[in-house]
């Protein structure tokens, strides 16, 4: 669907009519497009990776060659394919296809088989192709390899999925995991940077450098830097298998092309013919190469190959020159296939580096979206897959060598098939990556981090679930930096990154979210025809000489390839022509359109848009119709080296719609759910984005099919009477997160200070904000018996008195049964011995058995050994539970006030919540006041008000609009009413502001956090009480508690809390030498009786009359022993 059409068909305003629609319970014919778009970047990138990208990756894997018994063996992966998830043949089942719900229920991984065609050759002679299973790799839900792909809602429901299932995640051991989108440096573009830490890389190194993030067609990435040295030379820095290497630039230039030194000199000084310092520096760099005796390209290659081949692990028969070429293919400008193109790019980077070092240009800002791109899940998946396939080839050599040590192995098809089956499968590395988020890689894949790549897509509520697919993270390494530069919100982020939705605290500014109208387009586009088009517009090819001097021309780049030069005076005209071609879709520029066969036939209006290429934003760009896969040419004026033009034609881009089309355009999806957010203080909107994700809501409709560790459910959710139009655009009424409450702003009691709130007890008894927690536990009897023993099954012995009629004959509790602490939970039998076992319910919290699922093994032949028990824990709001409005106004429930004592209006209505008016002045959440008036008028007139930001202004005031509606209903214009005291019955003198506000109950509940302990377990080392609620630990008595006792004048209580009740112990000490370690109990001779008293003797003094006992903390004794191990003596003065 076109970008424009998706945002033209927005709801004109919110409505409640679909809540009373007779066909409300009937699944629609198609899924909601708006919800599917939220995960499109994840799904499309994975589709590209496993289809087109996989073939590119296979072609990029070089043949693996090694010597075996004086023969040269070559293994090449010629093709690979991933199949949809299915059970093996011969499995006991009704259907071979595996669906995600089955993997969630069984806590297994949703994966498909990866098979490859391996070509093998001996001494260069091809011998055949073997099809080999390499392992099972995870499959993204709703991708083209998923069995749910393109299924309508009705069929999705039949397969136990949500009708609006969006996909975009993996299922690993039954847990939904999302690969984070990461912000990476802009690909294939030289970025000038100043880094003071670069001075520590070697003698003479400076802080000036030019960095480039080189990315191949299959997304393999390598970071490369040019460093400016104090003597005027340049060092080339690259990474190979996580090891840093430095190479003088002259060697790299000389090895890439067979140019003479004079030709290299002339290419480097283009545009700087009058700069004597630069010319001398170039001469010196070339002179360094000559001093090593390298005069030709062949000599340079031999020189580099001889020194680097020890790190490359190449066969012995590779000559040094080929080893050097292998190094350049893997590490130097890997996005370019031609060595000549690499040469021209290095020359351009060198000129840019000298311009930066001499102050002729500014450094590029790596924190700007201009110089950034997004790493999508499919890219990470493909990069990791390619590396593991290369590792598999290496494991075959290792397996072959091990086999040859034991037996005589000949190389033939049959033996190779056996050896291939001994290779390292890809199953466990992929599951480890997605389960932990930690990257185990020999090369590092060009990342700056190796952890935090994946997160759990927890369904605490629906908007929290959505946020996982819209977030982009800057990187874990940036969180450790002390500077705040990386966290700043720059102006060019407008329309791409949400200025509201970012966490407060450590990840602030690093974990951002895409705006609602921002898209990550993942289609790959080819650019082969663009250079010819540029030449027709007046661009001089790179190997030709322009009519004007090079200093009067701009270099032109296309995907990191220097394609030529353009006259400065002609450049604006060329740029305007390219933009016109893209806007009008003229036939001569049809190659710029990659949208499809009919893309050039569609009509498009010339609408300005910012369209960054490769996920990066370029200031001042204009483009029309940024559909999927379109080509775009970029002109970057005022850039570092020469104000050069930069054309980007392929890759991954962000696009957003016309500025001004939507009032909520710059905001993220969740930020768009905040009513009247333009009337609130900005930090309150940030808080609501976080608290909205902590709300106990209605995250899904298939509770009976889920086996999550913990799920929350709001029992009585409601549709808000006041909401933005985006709420209806995403059909959030299917997944509500709160309740409409009558809120009176009044200081009625003393229990509502510091944001606390009073709740009407009658409302509480009628189910206000009542919720439940669903907890699932897997019970696998195979973990309880020894290996080889298969005799345990669920069941109970007839007449077992321990069961107390609370377990069924199958040993499991009854559905709907109430469980209390100590009740029988489940039972199982040993079929060999006939012995019965009963396990009791250990939680202190009462619950109800909601459902029980019986699970089998992968082949369907498992016995009755594994079940999943889901219990429901009712959670009525209790004192201390946390609530919040949609405006960042959070507070705890401080008191359930009797309805008889609540204030009431003249119509007899009592509020559900009493809110302290002191919460408004400092927070400045005017949006909540407006919502109260709007909710009140909506309830009176039977309407649903639009709370989209910026629909009201000073000329069109929200107060007047809603005030007039209240006045028309017979109420006060300002939303106030006269209330009567519930205690005295007398009318209150002040007018009380009362209305309807949508309130959220947060997951932070006292029932999950309270701790009570008198005595209990202690730490084995320090002998202090252990901490932690799950292990019945104590509550930490910290510095603030200590200060509170001191302030109350009860300082001696500290002796009891911190000593007597902590780790008090009695120790023996030598008064004379002051040692705690030297007193030892004397060893009795065999003639002594067991009843005879023994004395403590000091091993240093040799006396027993100087031993005394003292009370000291046990941790002090441990500390003294640790110091003694470090040869440090502690001497005590005993008084």
From Swiss-Prot:
Q: Where is this region: Fork loop 1?
A: 439-453
Annotated spans, Loop A:
236-247
Stored InterPro entries: DNA-dir_RNA_pol_su2, DNA-dir_RNAP_su2_dom, DNA-dir_RNAP_su2_hyb_sf, RNA_pol_bsu_CS, RNA_pol_bsu_protrusion, RNA_pol_Rpb2_2, RNA_pol_Rpb2_2_sf, RNA_pol_Rpb2_3
**Sequence positions bearing Phosphoserine:** 1051
* Record keywords: Chromosome, DNA-directed RNA polymerase, Magnesium, Metal-binding, Nucleotidyltransferase, Nucleus, Phosphoprotein, Transcription, Transferase, Zinc, Zinc-finger
Which domain of life, per UniProt?
Answer: Eukaryota
Residues at which DNA nontemplate strand binds: 1020
Which EC number applies? Answer: 2.7.7.6
Residues that bind RNA, according to the entry? 180, 367, 890
Any one Gene Ontology biological process term?
Answer: rRNA transcription
Site (Active site gating) at 687
Pfam family, any one: RNA_pol_Rpb2_1
Q: Which residues bind DNA template strand?
A: 1036
State where Mg(2+) binds. Answer: 755
Names of the cofactor(s): Mg(2+)
| Region of interest (Disordered), residue spans | 1-23
Cofactor annotation comment: Two Mg(2+) ions are coordinated by both the catalytic residues and the nucleic acid substrate to enhance substrate recognition and catalytic efficiency.
* Segments for region (Loop B): 194-208
Positions bound to Zn(2+): 1070, 1073, 1098, 1101
Q: Give the catalytic activity.
A: RNA(n) + a ribonucleoside 5'-triphosphate = RNA(n+1) + diphosphate
Asked if the keyword Zinc-finger belongs to this entry, the reply reads yes
Q: Where is this region: Fork loop 2?
A: 474-489
Q: How does it assemble?
A: Component of the RNA polymerase I (Pol I) complex consisting of 13 subunits: a ten-subunit catalytic core composed of POLR1A/RPA1, POLR1B/RPA2, POLR1C/RPAC1, POLR1D/RPAC2, POLR1H/RPA12, POLR2E/RPABC1, POLR2F/RPABC2, POLR2H/RPABC3, POLR2K/RPABC4 and POLR2L/RPABC5; a mobile stalk subunit POLR1F/RPA43 protruding from the core and additional subunits homologous to general transcription factors POLR1E/RPA49 and POLR1G/RPA34. Part of Pol I pre-initiation complex (PIC), in which Pol I core assembles with RRN3 and promoter-bound UTBF and SL1/TIF-IB complex.
Instruction: Name it.
Output: DNA-directed RNA polymerase I subunit RPA2
Q: Which organism is it from?
A: Rattus norvegicus
- What gene does this protein come from? Polr1b
